[in-house]
Each structure stands twice: as structure tokens, then as C-alpha cells.
Amino acid sequence: MSAYIALADGRVVEGRSRAPGTGRGELVFTTAYTGYEESLTDPSYAEQALTFSYPLIGNYGVREERFESDSVQPRVAVAHEFTEDVADWLEREGIPAIDAVDTRDLVTSIREQGAMRCGVAAGPDATPEQAKAQLEQCVEMSDHTDIGAQVSVDEPQVYEGSGLTVALLDCGAKKSIIDSLTARDAEVHVLPYDSTPEQVAAVEPDLVFVSNGPGDPANFEAAGEVVDAFAGELPIAGICLGQQVVARSLGGQTEKMEFGHRGLNQPVRDLDTDRVIMTTQNHGYSVADPGELAVTQVNVNDGTAEGLEGVGIDVITRQYHPEANPGPHDSLDFFDDVLEMAENHAPAMASD
């Protein structure tokens, strides 16, 4: 069965349909060579068409215990070759899947021209015109102004623990972030992305944590208002989009990257120790100006801010994914650091 990808640069790429349907999104790529289940269920890929640069996707099956959310998140999946397991899974999820594509050429186009809008049509009756019609309806990521509603919980959820209380603003949180906190005995209150400061205060948190998520951080104003309300009063942490939201709230600025960082092998240098770690990343925006925060870690490849910390206030954020899943575990101690920050802050709060 035929499939077509209509690109914003005017080209139409033909491939093979592995899961029928039409779709559209921002065409991006990941260099991850494992972890396709985690990538495909990562809420940060909402409203995107995910291309895998690794040629064979699905060579160790599909297991739900590795999922990072309850469903496949990208609007479209593209690879050089999908196995039957993955193709069947994507078809069950209603996600158009295309393979038999020269993904090297596609990735080169994204690297040279930047992430771009695309439209897709796949199946026995698919035509280039259908793909072009999808492209015409595709908008830029920044125009998805309420994308948080697609990926956040509707109601608060509580994960019991005997330790510190964490208010996690769910802007599209990966399951592994919650698991990393509960593994350290934290009680995690997962709150909707648009929670108010009053709703956050009601759980009496020891730590406010802004999660990862999709799209433009400028579209997560409510989370920024929570950060603004508690900065200096409670410890604050953030991962990926969370770093961007925290930075914007504390006087910083963010910008869209050409094609972003998506993969398992992004090198990050700690400016204090000069140590380099390998990290998992998935983001298309970065912090251009840290505002009131200090840059503590940078990307070795392009110098973008990978770690921020507060100056006189308790804030620690990371642009990469310390929880990995998939990827290296070089930075799992981030969760120990933020919980230690919260624990050390608690006596000071009690004495006020």
C-alpha cells in the first residue's frame, strides 16, 4: 500500500503504508537506536511527525511496561523499516505509519532546513493530494496554544510515599519522572497543567516540580504563574519544558531551535566540575536567556543551556531527561539533588 509525506518545502516523499490513515504535524527526527516504545509514548512528541534515523524499528517487540504514557503520542511515525509488531501497534492506535523511506535524506532535509510542517496519507486509497490537504491544515507548534490539555491529567492524582511531598505540574509528564520520585519515597501529587497557585498550595508541597511537555513554553502560562508565586518560598525543579517554563517565569527568554535535540547521546558539560555526561533529550525549544538563574551545564555540541540553578533561591532545572527511559543513567542523581534541596529547605520554612 502506498503512502505519501507532503513537506512544507514543496516535496512529496513516497513510501509504504504500515498503518493506514491521514495525519499532520511538525516533522522531527530522533537519533535514538533503542527505546522506540518509550519515544512513541512520550507526551513531548504531541502534534509531531516522528522520524526514526535508526533503520530498523521494532527488533525487540512491544511491551507495555516500557510505555511512558497510555497511548502513542506523535501524530505520525516514519522509519526506514518498521517490524510487524510496531506496525500492528501503531495501526491499533490509529497512528499513520510509513516506512520504505530514505530516512537519511529526510533527516538531512530537517537538519538543513529545520523542523517543518508535513501532511501524511497512508493506505490503499492514499494519494499525494490527500497528503497535501493535510499539510495545508498543519500549523506551527507555537500555534497549538492549548496543547497542554492533550497531555495533562484532568484531575489530580496521588502516588503515595512516606517522604517529601512533591507537587508535579503535569505538562505532559513521562511516567519515568513519577517513578523516579516515588522510588525515593516521595509522595507525588500529579496536578493538571493549568492548576492555580492556590490549588498547588492546597497539597502543602515541599517541592514544586514542572514536568516535560510538548511545544512552546510560552503556551504554558499557568505553570509559569505557579513558579512565579512560589519562587523563593518553596524549592522549584523542572525538566525539559519545565526548565523553559521556570526560566521564562524568572525573567528569562526561550527560543525555537532549528531542529532541536532528540536522541540518547547528547553530551552535556557541567561548568563546575568540567565533567561530561551523556543524556537523553527531546525538545525543540531552549533557554536563550536564563534571566535570574545561573547556567550550570551546557550542551557540548551547540552551547545551549542544559542546567540552571537559582541565585539566592532554591531552583534546579535540567533541559535533558535525567530519568532517561530510554537512554543513559548518567544523571539520575538529579532527583536526589532536588529532594535534598527540598529537605534542606524545610527547616528554614518551619522557622519562619
Task: Give the predicted meaning of each segment.
Residues 102, 240, 283, 321:
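Active-site glycine-centered loops adjacent to acidic/histidine catalytic or metal-binding residues
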Residues 274-312, 352:
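Catalytic beta-strand/loop cores that center a nucleophilic Ser/Cys/Thr
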Residues 27, 97, 188-190, 254, ...:
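Generic structural signal for residues in well-ordered beta-strands
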Residues 163-167, 187, 235, 278:
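Residues that mark the start of a beta-strand
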Residues 191-198, 216:
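Short acidic loop-to-helix transition motifs that present clustered carboxylates
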